Amino acid sequence: MIALGVNIDHVATLRQARGTDYPSPIKAALVAEESGADAITLHLREDRRHIQEEDVIILRERLKTRMNLESAVTEEMISFACRIKPHDICLVPERREELTTEGGLDVIRHFDQVSAACKRLTEAGIRVSLFVDARADQIDAAIRVGAPVIELHTGHYADAATSEAQQAELETIRSMAAYAFSRGLQVNAGHSLHYQNTTPIAFIPEITELNIGHAIVARALFIGFAQAVREMKTLMQEARA
């Protein structure tokens, strides 16, 4: 089976747009769990543009599945994670001016920093994942820093300008998923996946979990959050049938 991690960031984006206390990302997370989500993913960004510390603290107590906290590799965020102790943490690159995470974490360039963060988080009992581009050198670096999980960045696949380019990106993801799996890593994937492009990624047998958020929140505007989650989960399961 393949697992679905529902990212609730953009429920919080809508809330923050007007500075209200609704819509509640807490409620969205609980509805997602009831509707088939296997994990709840949320990104506490340094600029706090959507998810807030209070959201993380409340959800850590209320979730029945797993919390997958996305975080930059900074002292502030690593210390916060060690205090809250999510089930999983996915370390991601972060720039304040970006609309969304634009690429994978450069584990090679930031090797010492990532290695130290992995050690601290692991000692705190948190499973560490690294959000990386589908490249063998980055996967090898993830192994060397001691991360047991990687999340392959699917943005280049999703944003490819032509069907030929998209197919080439898919083949890269497929081969790198197999490579990482053969090296003993759990392989997750995510970024810019939606209802029209998820099936080929979900079909890759080495991939354990997909993290999807924006597309589900957008679909929920028309059919409701619970049904949007159920549709995505069904789509993923059918890819493996």
UniProtKB/Swiss-Prot annotation:
<dbReference type="GO" id="GO:0033856">
    <property type="term" value="F:pyridoxine 5'-phosphate synthase activity"/>
</dbReference>
<keyword id="KW-0963">Cytoplasm</keyword>
<feature type="binding site">
    <location>
        <position position="100"/>
    </location>
    <ligand>
        <name>1-deoxy-D-xylulose 5-phosphate</name>
    </ligand>
</feature>
<dbReference type="Pfam" id="PF03740">
    <property type="entry name" value="PdxJ"/>
</dbReference>
<comment type="similarity">
    <text>Belongs to the PNP synthase family.</text>
</comment>
<keyword id="KW-0664">Pyridoxine biosynthesis</keyword>
<feature type="binding site">
    <location>
        <begin position="213"/>
        <end position="214"/>
    </location>
    <ligand>
        <name>3-amino-2-oxopropyl phosphate</name>
    </ligand>
</feature>
<comment type="pathway">
    <text>Cofactor biosynthesis; pyridoxine 5'-phosphate biosynthesis; pyridoxine 5'-phosphate from D-erythrose 4-phosphate: step 5/5.</text>
</comment>
<dbReference type="InterPro" id="IPR013785">
    <property type="entry name" value="Aldolase_TIM"/>
</dbReference>
<feature type="binding site">
    <location>
        <begin position="9"/>
        <end position="10"/>
    </location>
    <ligand>
        <name>1-deoxy-D-xylulose 5-phosphate</name>
    </ligand>
</feature>
<feature type="binding site">
    <location>
        <position position="50"/>
    </location>
    <ligand>
        <name>1-deoxy-D-xylulose 5-phosphate</name>
    </ligand>
</feature>
<feature type="active site" description="Proton donor">
    <location>
        <position position="191"/>
    </location>
</feature>
<feature type="binding site">
    <location>
        <position position="7"/>
    </location>
    <ligand>
        <name>3-amino-2-oxopropyl phosphate</name>
    </ligand>
</feature>
<dbReference type="GO" id="GO:0005829">
    <property type="term" value="C:cytosol"/>
</dbReference>
<keyword id="KW-0808">Transferase</keyword>
<protein>
    <recommendedName>
        <fullName>Pyridoxine 5'-phosphate synthase</fullName>
        <ecNumber>2.6.99.2</ecNumber>
    </recommendedName>
</protein>
<feature type="binding site">
    <location>
        <position position="18"/>
    </location>
    <ligand>
        <name>3-amino-2-oxopropyl phosphate</name>
    </ligand>
</feature>
<feature type="active site" description="Proton acceptor">
    <location>
        <position position="70"/>
    </location>
</feature>
<feature type="binding site">
    <location>
        <position position="192"/>
    </location>
    <ligand>
        <name>3-amino-2-oxopropyl phosphate</name>
    </ligand>
</feature>
<comment type="function">
    <text>Catalyzes the complicated ring closure reaction between the two acyclic compounds 1-deoxy-D-xylulose-5-phosphate (DXP) and 3-amino-2-oxopropyl phosphate (1-amino-acetone-3-phosphate or AAP) to form pyridoxine 5'-phosphate (PNP) and inorganic phosphate.</text>
</comment>
<dbReference type="InterPro" id="IPR004569">
    <property type="entry name" value="PyrdxlP_synth_PdxJ"/>
</dbReference>
<feature type="binding site">
    <location>
        <position position="45"/>
    </location>
    <ligand>
        <name>1-deoxy-D-xylulose 5-phosphate</name>
    </ligand>
</feature>
<comment type="subunit">
    <text>Homooctamer; tetramer of dimers.</text>
</comment>
<feature type="site" description="Transition state stabilizer">
    <location>
        <position position="151"/>
    </location>
</feature>
<dbReference type="GO" id="GO:0008615">
    <property type="term" value="P:pyridoxine biosynthetic process"/>
</dbReference>
<feature type="active site" description="Proton acceptor">
    <location>
        <position position="43"/>
    </location>
</feature>
<dbReference type="InterPro" id="IPR036130">
    <property type="entry name" value="Pyridoxine-5'_phos_synth"/>
</dbReference>
